[in-house]
């Protein structure tokens, strides 16, 4: 019992320092400063919020010194065994006792600004940033969260005045909203980034947010026409500034810490002609849902001008009503007729980042007939006035005629998006002959091609090849006579080629080329001749043997011409491209050393020719 009493006394004494400014030095000689959040005696841990590191400050004896850091950490949990020194630099501010006015059962809700604390620390400043919105007997709107046990995800607005001595870590700040006058439960608001009083908000965060939910009516103080109306309070960045605008005093706004809002004359007339606060009860049922309520059509009268709302508000309205986003044009402005079922469009204020308008989906490509059908449901707009708000950017005015001109007609014949393949486009040469990628080019003579420009295509066979019928059509005597003639013509030109006696030509006996009954046929007969002669066969013999075996080798061949025809020579008909090569002459126009030398420079072979 004595130990329990001692532990309870020590824990209560430690809890009394919660909210104090603590200077903590670790065993690594690094000093930290932050607000004491909790002390866990069981785990020997200390939690600080809004912690900043000041480095070693010259205390480290060995090794490099750790420089201070300007980064402020929201929460750090320290291990008690690694803490070298702990000092309390400032005690938590003394909370004034609760006023006795809250004990009156006739009071449903009270609202008064909290006094500014004297301490300059961040959490104590945050504790006095928002007015006290607490109500009597803990109404259902209060989000009761145990700050001693868990880290809150957002700052609840209902129990700002009932924290006691333990301020919360400022993880997220809540947006503008005030409880309705009839004591409705406070809703789950979107986590808008709103810094505490006295902390500046970056400009990059002020523009894209645009305050999606600003439709909750202010508390019924009745001090001015703005607070008595049911119009939502809107931030000053949503309204265009004009020369005839009027300034609202900060005292007339529900939050005294806010900057004065500049409103144009059209908005002021709207506020003065707005309905009475009795509409607040009519707006209560939509507030009970988690969806974003429809803001503009129920509250604005029909004879007023719609000011420029942000694009996020329009999106929230369309998300709650289930209307499509693709039917609306990009951005429009102008007076709007009585509320309809079509989505509202808006114009951005000058200075708002253009990334908001880029997020909107673009309209699909449709025909003019479809535009005429969808144009009947568009919001009727008149041309924008030029003498009023001149700093509003008019990006596009919506009308069915304008959309018809901007959308191309898809039924017209259009050129292909991608260019045609290079093989399908024959190139016209200056000499009148076309050479599509050198496919099907048949060189003849000295580079003047005879090809008809046909592209090389792969033949598709539908039946098996008939060898017997093709053998009957093949006339070997005609081919051999043609070869003999070419040999005689070329014999006079080259005296260095080896001489072959005509008497030696008929040494090879005529044998059938293919015999099904024999295992060996005439295809392998040259090995017997080589064994008998013990030397390489002569060129004329080899050429005749190859002709009998394979026929005219390069007659229907399109490729690169082979090694100079059929002789075992050094002729190279490189790049014949369909040239006719006979023997070792490389073909006519196909390269090689025969007559018709070099079809467009596609072969420079030299072959050993016989007489």
UniProtKB/Swiss-Prot annotation:
Keyword Amino-acid biosynthesis: no
Biased composition (Basic residues): 441-453
GO-annotated molecular function: mRNA binding; protein homodimerization activity
Disruption phenotype: Seedlings with pale and weak cotyledons, characterized by disorganized veins. Impaired mRNA decapping and reduced P-bodies size. Altered transient seed storage proteins (SSPs) translational repression and degradation during seed germination.
Domain Sm: residue ranges: 9-92
Biased composition (Basic and acidic residues): 528-547
Cellular location(s): Cytoplasm, P-body
Stored PANTHER family: SCD6 PROTEIN-RELATED, TRAILER HITCH, ISOFORM H
Stated name of the protein: Protein decapping 5
Native organism: Arabidopsis thaliana (Mouse-ear cress)
Organismal lineage: Eukaryota, Viridiplantae, Streptophyta, Embryophyta, Tracheophyta
